[in-house]
Amino acid sequence: MDTAGKVIKCKAAVLWGTNQPFSIEDIEVAPPKAKEVRVKILATGICGTDDHVIKGTMVSKFPVIVGHEAVGIVESVGEEVTTVRPGDKVIPLFLPQCRECNPCRNPEGNLCIRSDLTGRGVLADGTTRFTCKGKPVQHFMNTSTFTEYTVLDESSVAKIDAEAPPEKACLIGCGFSTGYGAAVKTAKVSPGSTCAVFGLGGVGLSVVMGCKAAGASRIIGIDINKDKFQKALDVGATECINPRDFTKPISEVLSDMTGNTVQYTFEVIGRLETMVDALSSCHMNYGTSVVVGAPPSAKMLSYDPMLLFTGRTWKGCVFGGWKSRDDVPKLVTEFLEKKFDLGQLITHTLPFHNISEGFELLYSGQSIRTVLTF
């Protein structure tokens, strides 16, 4: 492309501090350096993790460009890039896969050491490619997709099928893959089992879809927003409950409902209290509980160790346990083969400049997933 090797001026949604609104700014995006890729974003989803930065519950430096769930087209590549080329359709990866570190080389690992889940805010060489009003702007989780153009390390880019529709396939960059994988890959839900899913947002519904795909016979959705129940039933939940409708602890409610046979529970909210509730709700001898929701930074969890001593398994899950560069293209292929329907998760599609409206839909509970298009 004729922009290769040049600074690109474009629009981006910049956060200048916590609890501040997005500001649509003119920014400059530098050319990619060695082993880097510059991508033109086509569509990007709004995820609750982005809101953690706004609220200050996830550590970040400012100013920053958040967003991490997207599909784009490679505009140009730096030296030594071998896996993608200009014109390729790609998904940015908030969880990279360098294929060299211990977690990448271990068949059970996926948390690459190049991951930036702690707010470092720069690329692998320690610098940023974004500038706004003469100031450097931080990257977010190796991605930064709330911008017309972004720069990523090659290890944070997965080439996908050119036929994949960006406004749907972008969900594979985070929300869908995280939830679906939590059920089929991390928990390894068994056929005929009973599952309980705490939180019925986009990721929680993806967990429900994964439980159904794995053959669970009973899938109980749990949320304080009853407006989400019908969508949960549509994607595979067998019943839904609101904890506020009961005076008993939710673990006792689930035990009464199922005869104490809940084998798998999933916390998809990111609240410390519900993490313990989910653990308490699975069977004490053979139950597995998976933490899927991103926890708040610098918070400590307190729980009764007897919950684990009696035989429960407590697991964490980042990006559904998938190895990103290897598995994302496969998930896109499965989507194109209609093995799952991403359209069920999308409630709103808005132009990028309406990003603030998209977050208001999230806050009000009206949206499952809002996708921004460019």
UniProtKB/Swiss-Prot annotation:
<dbReference type="GO" id="GO:0035276">
    <property type="term" value="F:ethanol binding"/>
</dbReference>
<comment type="function">
    <text>Catalyzes the NAD-dependent oxidation of all-trans-retinol, alcohol, aldehyde and omega-hydroxy fatty acids and their derivatives. Oxidizes preferentially all trans-retinol, all-trans-4-hydroxyretinol, 9-cis-retinol, 2-hexenol, and long chain omega-hydroxy fatty acids such as juniperic acid. In vitro can also catalyze the NADH-dependent reduction of all-trans-retinal and aldehydes and their derivatives. Reduces preferentially all trans-retinal, all-trans-4-oxoretinal and hexanal. Catalyzes in the oxidative direction with higher efficiency.</text>
</comment>
<comment type="subunit">
    <text>Homodimer.</text>
</comment>
<keyword id="KW-0007">Acetylation</keyword>
<dbReference type="GO" id="GO:0048019">
    <property type="term" value="F:receptor antagonist activity"/>
</dbReference>
<dbReference type="GO" id="GO:0042572">
    <property type="term" value="P:retinol metabolic process"/>
</dbReference>
<dbReference type="GO" id="GO:0019841">
    <property type="term" value="F:retinol binding"/>
</dbReference>
<dbReference type="GO" id="GO:0050153">
    <property type="term" value="F:omega-hydroxydecanoate dehydrogenase activity"/>
</dbReference>
<dbReference type="GO" id="GO:0001523">
    <property type="term" value="P:retinoid metabolic process"/>
</dbReference>
<feature type="binding site">
    <location>
        <begin position="199"/>
        <end position="204"/>
    </location>
    <ligand>
        <name>NAD(+)</name>
    </ligand>
</feature>
<dbReference type="InterPro" id="IPR013154">
    <property type="entry name" value="ADH-like_N"/>
</dbReference>
<dbReference type="GO" id="GO:0006068">
    <property type="term" value="P:ethanol catabolic process"/>
</dbReference>
<dbReference type="GO" id="GO:0004022">
    <property type="term" value="F:alcohol dehydrogenase (NAD+) activity"/>
</dbReference>
<dbReference type="GO" id="GO:0042573">
    <property type="term" value="P:retinoic acid metabolic process"/>
</dbReference>
<feature type="binding site">
    <location>
        <position position="68"/>
    </location>
    <ligand>
        <name>Zn(2+) 1</name>
    </ligand>
</feature>
<dbReference type="InterPro" id="IPR036291">
    <property type="entry name" value="NAD(P)-bd_dom_sf"/>
</dbReference>
<dbReference type="GO" id="GO:0004745">
    <property type="term" value="F:all-trans-retinol dehydrogenase (NAD+) activity"/>
</dbReference>
<dbReference type="GO" id="GO:0010430">
    <property type="term" value="P:fatty acid omega-oxidation"/>
</dbReference>
<feature type="binding site">
    <location>
        <position position="101"/>
    </location>
    <ligand>
        <name>Zn(2+) 2</name>
    </ligand>
</feature>
<keyword id="KW-0520">NAD</keyword>
<feature type="binding site">
    <location>
        <position position="104"/>
    </location>
    <ligand>
        <name>Zn(2+) 2</name>
    </ligand>
</feature>
<feature type="binding site">
    <location>
        <position position="174"/>
    </location>
    <ligand>
        <name>Zn(2+) 1</name>
    </ligand>
</feature>
<dbReference type="GO" id="GO:0051287">
    <property type="term" value="F:NAD binding"/>
</dbReference>
<dbReference type="GO" id="GO:0004031">
    <property type="term" value="F:aldehyde oxidase activity"/>
</dbReference>
<protein>
    <recommendedName>
        <fullName>All-trans-retinol dehydrogenase [NAD(+)] ADH7</fullName>
        <ecNumber>1.1.1.105</ecNumber>
        <ecNumber>1.1.1.1</ecNumber>
        <ecNumber>1.1.1.66</ecNumber>
    </recommendedName>
</protein>
<comment type="similarity">
    <text>Belongs to the zinc-containing alcohol dehydrogenase family. Class-IV subfamily.</text>
</comment>
<keyword id="KW-0443">Lipid metabolism</keyword>
<dbReference type="GO" id="GO:0006067">
    <property type="term" value="P:ethanol metabolic process"/>
</dbReference>
<feature type="binding site">
    <location>
        <begin position="292"/>
        <end position="294"/>
    </location>
    <ligand>
        <name>NAD(+)</name>
    </ligand>
</feature>
<dbReference type="GO" id="GO:0009617">
    <property type="term" value="P:response to bacterium"/>
</dbReference>
<dbReference type="Pfam" id="PF00107">
    <property type="entry name" value="ADH_zinc_N"/>
</dbReference>
<feature type="binding site">
    <location>
        <position position="112"/>
    </location>
    <ligand>
        <name>Zn(2+) 2</name>
    </ligand>
</feature>
<feature type="modified residue" description="N-acetylmethionine">
    <location>
        <position position="1"/>
    </location>
</feature>
<dbReference type="GO" id="GO:0008270">
    <property type="term" value="F:zinc ion binding"/>
</dbReference>
<dbReference type="InterPro" id="IPR011032">
    <property type="entry name" value="GroES-like_sf"/>
</dbReference>
<feature type="binding site">
    <location>
        <position position="228"/>
    </location>
    <ligand>
        <name>NAD(+)</name>
    </ligand>
</feature>
<dbReference type="InterPro" id="IPR020843">
    <property type="entry name" value="PKS_ER"/>
</dbReference>
<feature type="binding site">
    <location>
        <position position="369"/>
    </location>
    <ligand>
        <name>NAD(+)</name>
    </ligand>
</feature>
<dbReference type="GO" id="GO:0005829">
    <property type="term" value="C:cytosol"/>
</dbReference>
<feature type="binding site">
    <location>
        <position position="98"/>
    </location>
    <ligand>
        <name>Zn(2+) 2</name>
    </ligand>
</feature>
<feature type="binding site">
    <location>
        <position position="47"/>
    </location>
    <ligand>
        <name>Zn(2+) 1</name>
    </ligand>
</feature>
<keyword id="KW-0479">Metal-binding</keyword>
